[in-house]
């Protein structure tokens, strides 16, 4: 039988439980979210519902998610009631789908995130940078997994050349044949929690099965015409790995809408900010007609990739809009950093 320590319990969460000062509550980790019911890791596996007080008091992003540690009221039956969510060490978020401006948490208390990119026409460096930005806000270590290497034997170097400038760890693998699975497992230390992120059809379920050594996750087909996949993972679930780590599999993400602040783009686009600091004038707008602009000079010399810079401008613009929607007052109080970048 696994203990709470096996699921990642540590002093951080113990302090959160003690702060509640409710000795009748016990700790548990959320293993799966089935909508109206959550599966918990307790001394015995239990299903749980949320208390009415928690449902009405918490914002949607603060309700229990897969990976969360929670305080639970246990009963003699198979069920339990979640009374509180313990303070998180990390959360990976995006803007929720739809017209409302809401934060959606995809996974919590994660140490390392594997961002899967398929080595086919679905590969997208701009999309990858969106993931890296969100992970930088979460303080989660990113590892890019270049999957389906068996389909791109002659083109692997081409894809690697697009990842290397991002200064991120990467692993080339073929989940279908298990190639690279051992390297991925070595990247998850005992007690650490990892999550698989990526679009539908990139092979997350196949990789989950390879890492677990069994066909636990359903695997779906990919459309030939565009290499797009259908959702085969319908819910988020946390699994225990043989080496002592844990793995969260997630449904495919069709669109990663950003959630954050434009001023935090400096980590993902360190090169752009470094060039901006070299401009002749401190009030440089980095437009094509600016004199002494280091960014324009780098674009002309191809030192700075135009697609990379355009993606920076797109993400910066998207985050500005998000900021004004979260709080319209922010529109009058923008910081000067990214205000200097023109959209050209």
Language model segments and positions:
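Signal for well-folded cores of large energy- and translation-related assemblies
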Residues: 9, 18, 133-136, 150, ...
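Canonical P-loop GTPase G-domain recognition
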Residues: 141, 148-202
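A conserved segment at the C-terminal end of the G1
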Residues: 204-220
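Helix-rich effector regions associated with P-loop NTPase G domains
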Residues: 2-4, 24, 59-76, 87-106, ...
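Phosphate-binding glycine-rich loops and their immediate beta-loop-alpha structural context
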Residues: 105-168
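N-terminal accessory targeting/assembly segments
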Residues: 1-125
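Catalytic P-loop NTPase motifs of RecA-like helicase/translocase cores
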Residues: 123, 152-153, 179, 254-256
């Amino acid at each position: 039988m696994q203990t709470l320590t096996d699921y990642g319990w540590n002093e951080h969460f113990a302090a959160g439980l003690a702060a509640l000062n409710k000795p009748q509550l016990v700790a548990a980790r959320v293993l799966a979210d089935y909508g109206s019911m959550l599966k918990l890791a307790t001394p015995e596996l239990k299903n749980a519902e949320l208390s009415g007080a928690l449902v009405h008091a918490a914002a949607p992003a603060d309700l229990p998610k897969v990976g969360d540690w929670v305080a639970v009221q246990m009963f003699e039956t198979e069920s339990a009631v979640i009374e509180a969510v313990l303070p998180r060490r990390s959360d990976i978020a995006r803007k929720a789908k739809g017209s409302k401006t809401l934060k959606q948490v995809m996974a919590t208390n994660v140490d390392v995130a594997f961002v899967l990119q398929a080595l086919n026409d679905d590969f997208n460096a701009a999309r990858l940078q969106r993931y890296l930005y969100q992970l930088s806000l979460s303080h989660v270590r990113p590892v890019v997994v270049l999957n389906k290497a068996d389909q791109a034997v002659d083109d692997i170097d081409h894809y690697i050349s697009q990842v290397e400038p991002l200064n991120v760890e990467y692993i080339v693998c073929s989940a279908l044949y298990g190639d690279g699975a051992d390297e991925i497992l070595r990247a998850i230390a005992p007690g650490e929690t990892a999550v698989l992120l990526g679009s539908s059809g990139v092979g997350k379920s196949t990789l989950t099965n390879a890492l677990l050594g069994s066909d636990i996750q359903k695997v779906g087909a990919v459309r030939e015409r565009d290499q797009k996949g259908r959702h085969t993972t319908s819910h988020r679930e946390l699994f225990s790995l043989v080496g002592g780590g844990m793995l969260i599999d997630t449904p495919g993400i069709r669109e990663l809408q950003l959630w954050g602040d434009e001023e935090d783009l400096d980590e993902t686009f360190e090169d752009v900010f470094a060039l901006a600091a070299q401009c002749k004038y401190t009030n440089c707008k980095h437009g094509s007609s600016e004199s002494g602009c280091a960014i324009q000079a780098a674009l002309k010399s191809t030192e700075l990739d135009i697609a990379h810079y355009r993606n920076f401008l797109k993400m910066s613009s998207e985050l500005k809009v998000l900021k004004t929607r979260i709080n319209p007052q922010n529109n009058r109080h923008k910081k000067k950093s990214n205000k200097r970048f023109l959209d050209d």
